[in-house]
Amino acid sequence: MDIIGIGYLGFETARMDEWRTYGPEVLGWQIGESPQADRDSLYFRMDDRRHRFAFHPGKTDRLAYIGWEARGKLEFQAAVQRLREAGIEVAQGDAALRGVRDVVRFRDPVGYQHELFYSQKWMPRSFIPGRPHGGFTAGARGLGHIVLITPEFPPELEHFLTVVMGFHYYGAGAGKGKTAFYRSKLNNSTSHDIAYGHGPDKMGIQHIGLFVNNLRDVGETYDIVKQRNLPMMMTLGQHTQDPHVSFYHFSPGGFAFEIITELEPWHHDGFELNPEKLSIWGHEQVGPILGPSVRAPEEVLDPQGLEILARWRQPA
């Protein structure tokens, strides 16, 4: 599939007021205009797109959907056909609500909700950060990356990602346990768009990575996080496989944000690396690797997602 990367992410949250403050004042996002049909939800901008993050009222905090961006109409149509030929149930989405030309919805083999769209609304030079900020690196690479936890890691999940979605397998990283990193076909700027980590009887978001335009933006966000005594997962550091500097802190939703800047443009290694350790400097772990967002599947998935997961789930 000719997919650029993650175009938008949607969440359910019971902490709308906390996000309304945290998004602009900590991350530097702009509060966007909510669609007429979804006034109770909170939409955030991080570039000239209509939105990148949407938070919908809910009883708990959890991921609602991942929106993958196809390059254009023909690529979108080919991707939808590929999903259907693979036997994946595809449902029509609400294009007006998402602010796109067209969108469909489907599930991965462990129950997470995905969407595929093309042509999201945008307006040049319209992004105004919520605080002084140099801006986010998104555009042609997508908004960043997401790492999900899954209680089961069936071969069908790898098949879905590499054969159906057409993602490149990047590797397992240096973490302990089973983790796999993937990037979309058209992403030549970052090592991964999505990763799945195996956590027995656990599901949810482990972290989301956001790229900012310069080191100052990383440092100023780091200072704000410390000044507000927000919980942190890892201090400033540099991963072994990426020429980037980043740190991790926890959001109101219980998952971490990794705030990243590039020291130099990333280039594909040409072969799968097997790093001795996660980072070459820094990234001292000062908080849990799995935050409050990672919980039992019954607290993370809706009934349809749980039904899909039940095909692989081992009895306790």
PLM region spans:
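Short, charged/polar, Gly/Pro-enriched secondary-structure boundary elements
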Residues: 49-54, 111-115, 188-194, 254-256
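Conserved active-site tyrosine of GNAT-family acetyltransferases
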Residues: 19-24, 83, 111, 156-162, ...
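Conserved donor-binding loop and adjoining core beta-sheet/short helix segment
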Residues: 33-71, 92
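Vicinal oxygen chelate
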Residues: 5-14, 58-152, 180-185, 229-316, ...
